[in-house]
Amino acid sequence: MPVKKKRKSPGVAAAVAEDGGLKKCKISSYCRSQPPARLISGEEHFSSKKCLAWFYEYAGPDEVVGPEGMEKFCEDIGVEPENIIMLVLAWKLEAESMGFFTKEEWLKGMTSLQCDCTEKLQNKFDFLRSQLNDISSFKNIYRYAFDFARDKDQRSLDIDTAKSMLALLLGRTWPLFSVFYQYPEQSKYRVMNKDQWYNVLEFSRAVHADLSNYDEDGAWPVLLDEFVEWQKVRQTS
């Protein structure tokens, strides 16, 4: 989860690099070597007071964990801000804005996770990652990411932010991702709305990499119809 400098900034969820003329995303998406978490005794019960004190280690005077606090928090737990585990954590905290945790979000979410210190959260990393392997949970995380990443004064995601979030969520698992990633560069699309966003996930799950089972009469958004048409032309050229 990238650290935003302003609440209104869309942020970027993945670093992108040139490779052989095609843009490939370099994302620390599912794992990164973290310092081993200290084993927590089963007798150390969750403490709301301790959780609140932990929050104030990172919060500013406005009682919000902002960019600087988020950077320190990520350093302490041993996770890069753009690691997908931060998106899953934000989902668990029901955070509204990328790069920010309010006190209410922190206390509600960490209470749900029963985490009141760094070590307990590190011991939850495997659980957080497991949410990505559950079809229902992943769908919820994917849908959450749209509102989480968009500017709150906009109804759609700008296309660069959409591409970065798609890279984070689908870059490792969708065979057509690298092709779809290139498509907006030569298309008319500069934003992605919620319906398009939702349907990209369904498309990635339902349609074969060779597009052989794509139903032109299906209820897909025009964006995906045009993507398929564009890709078929490329395949035959």
From Swiss-Prot:
In terms of superkingdom, the source organism counts as Eukaryota
Record's comment on post-translational modification: Phosphorylation at Ser-41 is independent of cullin's interaction. Phosphorylated in response to both TICAM1 and MYD88 dependent Toll-like receptor (TLR) pathway activation. Phosphorylated in response to IL1B stimulation.
Keywords of the record: Cytoplasm, Cytoskeleton, Nucleus, Phosphoprotein
- The chain positions of domain DCUN1 read 46-232
Q: Does the keyword Protein biosynthesis apply?
A: no
Please describe the quaternary structure of this protein.
Part of a complex that contains DCUN1D5, CUL1 and RBX1; this interaction is bridged by CUL1. Interacts (via the DCUN1 domain) with the unneddylated cullins: interacts with CUL1, CUL2, CUL3, CUL4A, CUL4B and CUL5; these interactions promote the cullin neddylation and the identity of the cullin dictates the affinity of the interaction. Interacts (via DCUN1 domain) with UBE2M (N-terminally acetylated form) and probably with UBE2F (N-terminally acetylated form).
The name of this protein is DCN1-like protein 5
Q: Which organism is it from?
A: Pongo abelii (Sumatran orangutan)
